[in-house]
Amino acid sequence: MRKRKLKMASGIFLLLLIAGLSGCGQKNTEKENLCHIVLEAGEGYHVTDPARTIKSGSDVSFTVTLDDNWQFLGTNYHGETEITKEDDGKTVNLVLHEVNYSESICIQAEKGKYEIVYDANGGQNISGDSDRVSICYRGTHQRINTSTGTDLFARDGYTLLGWNTRADGTGQAVGLGSRTEWKEGLVLYAQWIPWTGEADFVYKKVSGFAVITSYIGKAQQICVPSSLGGFPVRTIREQAFADTECKTVILSPGIHEVEKWAFRNSRLEQLYIYDDLEKISDYAFQDCDMLRTLHINSIEAPAYSGDYFDTFQDKYDRLLSLKDKKKIVLFSGSSTRFGYDSAMLDQAFPDYEVVNMGVFAYSPALPQLELIRSCMKEGDILLDSPEFDAANRQFCYQKELDYATFAMMESNYDAFADLDLREYAQVFTAFSAYQTARQDMERKNYDVCASDYDEDGNEVEEPSYNEYGDYVVYRPNSTSEKPIYGLPVNYTVNAFPKETYIDSANAEFQKFLDQGIKVYFTYSPRNK
């Protein structure tokens, strides 16, 4: 019977084509179509139950466990896939949707080649006895995103504040999850800060959590503990730190809410928070006129990796690497991403490097320009081509930050710490909006790169961005002159009052000119 079936296979296949049948198996009254799916074995991973038999058209799920330092890239399955990575960094849940044929699926995995060694430096390894943990990275960005750390090390009575290239903290510092320049033999040491004594806090227990109602200490530096009296600290109530003389405050992981006026009229100069903080507003820091620096440590998986917002930090990496070289920096919103041909500029001006810093026009330009200016020097050129339908943002009139500001900082929060908060408004309100926006978003990882996707989030075979930061995927001409978002576009003088837009733009440009940086101003590039 088996031999007969083999001989008749070609004939049966022809009959199926004629009949217009499809599927995995021959359907009859006794048996439904079945598909046999096998995940092939390979280096760097193990699949639990790799062979499955399912009904045609249904989904099938697998659990893939990665070896140390290996990364899951995807599969060669041509249908829709759903990939979920667990927090341990090794477990991958893979779902193949609507499987219609029997086939063998190849897993694409890659071993990282950029090693960073993390030293507990007084802490304890959560998953082993060694004081050091080695992690290898793929190097999908010019600089490497460091570990978020809290999944590696712990230390009773201390908060992990960041990493440093020296154990005593005198080397180069980098925040948890933020980027650092890689070099052979790189070791990053955990930096710990002791919790401020419990006696300095007045708190009450609410629904199993500690709520801080007052601070009665006099320290210049306060590290608010993750727990008090054995209860996790969740909330800091209004007026709790009002009028204090402290200059530095660290809000440990697990604190989810800071109420209005919590630090009112304090002498606070710098604040450390973690990106599990959900609710905080500028009212919490009313009359804190000396608050200048906000450090954000990442302990949550990123949501905007691979998004166009994520390109800001990739472009910023390039800008940092060219800090000491002559360069032309292009700036505006997405029109700059789409519209410039930086390779032509590079060819026309061989003495200059070219960096395309355009990302998104509908977010305030001021903080972006300030970060750009910090990487430029005398003789460099800024070519600004603002988009007029976002004039209040593009001409630096709007000082209020928004969720998109933080979306651009997500893959390197350290960049935000270089901004002077006193130059902006609604900083913490914007951070809360950002947290709300990404609350229900799919979480990814820092290895995901925007150049692997097009503008709509579809995977591409060739990089969608070139080395300069230009978006290079073909874009057809517009079919309409109607502006997006319904915003008016007015190119007349009356639309740009001098005391608002023009003076604001000139004030920012003057900072560049004072550093010997040439500033050129033009219309934004556009297609037909």
Specify the residue positions occupied by each region the protein language model found:
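Secreted/periplasmic serine-hydrolase-like ester/acetyl group-modifying domain
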Residues: 399-517
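N-terminal secretory targeting modules
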Residues: 295-325
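Bacterial N-terminal signal peptides
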Residues: 11-20
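Structural signature of tandem-repeat unit edges
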Residues: 8, 201-206, 217-234, 244-257, ...
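Secondary-structure capping and domain/repeat boundary segments
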Residues: 24-73, 77-194, 298
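Membrane-embedded segments
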Residues: 327-412
